Amino acid sequence: MSFNTFGHMFRVTTFGESHGVALGCVVDGCPPRIPLTAAEIQRDLDRRKPGQSRFTTQRQEADQVKILSGVMETERGQVTTGTPIALMIENTDQRSKDYSDIKDKYRPGHADYTYEAKYGIRDYRGGGRSSARETAARVAAGAVARKVIPDVKVRAALVQMGPHKIDRANWNWDDVTRNPFFCPDATKAAFFEEYLDEIRKSGSSIGAVIEVVAENVPAGWGAPIYGKLDSDLAAALMSINAVKGVEIGAGFGAAELRGEDNADEMRAGNNGPVFLSNHAGGILGGISTGQAVVARFAVKPTSSILTPRKTVDRAGGETDILTKGRHDPCVGIRAVPVAEAMVACVLADHFLRHRGQNG
């Protein structure tokens, strides 16, 4: 299997499966002499790890990260050396027996059939590499990326669950840390609690929309045509499990606007142009404008539900399937820290590419 690596100058390779011994990543291209400790990486992993509320999978994983290479102790503390940084997270709470009854059946909505169609083999134990468990490694890599671009603030929030959207007038970033949904609207978070409880108890699942905002991105990152910043952001977010759509700035909403409404007008400021709106999401022509970079993505409902579903088996026979195991009733919740990590990695990559070309 190829395509386990992304990035150009800040390159991340992830490895491991849902029910394997461990998973992790190798970060190549991180500049030297950057302070980096396991505790800093752990803070991000703790936001993503499972089992923290009844609204996420009850699989209990500590997700303790180990730094295997790429750092050393100095008089300034632990810093990067410029060599590849290897990070490992052990799996400790696998229950592969939950999948033994369905190992020859293709789960609807999962990658079971497509993996087998491509490779002639698949890891049925929790989905193997197609499991969202893989994203723990991405979050670890994202923590390293944040250290490369310390002035850039990357934050994400859940802004819609099912058909229910937050009230943007109530947006408060502080509220994101005060509820289990990473929701910036405290009133809507209380509603989500009742709403998702009902869905969870029925054995079903629901989708969500996540918004990512990167502030303090200077003008000039990105490149025209095939190196566009928004193209790389879209690809990175689209690579997250269960994501089915990505938009930048006004996104699909721009199709409903007239030209005079969509184009972000400018006025002169002390340090360059001041934009009067941000429908472009902080990117024009594939290059950052200096405004906040804004992206949103849609996450489909978790495919593993407690309702019997129609499917086929490996022999081609028609059958029914009932998925066991422990699953998120709304996988969009834990996609929030994953999205931050992916955006941080892309921005760190573009920072290094910009510095390499322009000094």
Curated annotation (Swiss-Prot):
Catalytic activity of the protein: 5-O-(1-carboxyvinyl)-3-phosphoshikimate = chorismate + phosphate
Pathway: Metabolic intermediate biosynthesis; chorismate biosynthesis; chorismate from D-erythrose 4-phosphate and phosphoenolpyruvate: step 7/7
Keyword Zinc attributed: no
Chain sites annotated for binding NADP(+): 48, 54
Binding site for FMN: 129-131, 241-242, 285, 300-304, 326
Pfam families assigned to the protein according to its UniProt record, in alphabetical order: Chorismate_synt (PF01264)
Protein's GO biological process: amino acid biosynthetic process; aromatic amino acid family biosynthetic process; chorismate biosynthetic process
InterPro entries referenced in this protein's UniProt entry, alphabetically: Chorismate_synth, Chorismate_synth_AroC_sf, Chorismate_synthase_CS
Cofactor note: Reduced FMN (FMNH(2)).
Signal peptide: none
UniProt keyword annotation of Flavoprotein present: yes
Alphabetic keyword roster: Amino-acid biosynthesis, Aromatic amino acid biosynthesis, FAD, Flavoprotein, FMN, Lyase, NADP
Entry GO terms, CC: cytosol
EC number: 4.2.3.5
Essential cofactor(s): FMNH2
A single MF term (Gene Ontology): chorismate synthase activity
Protein family: Belongs to the chorismate synthase family.
Quaternary structure, from the entry: Homotetramer.
Function: This reaction introduces a second double bond into the aromatic ring system.
The protein's name in its UniProt record: Chorismate synthase
Gene name of the record: aroC
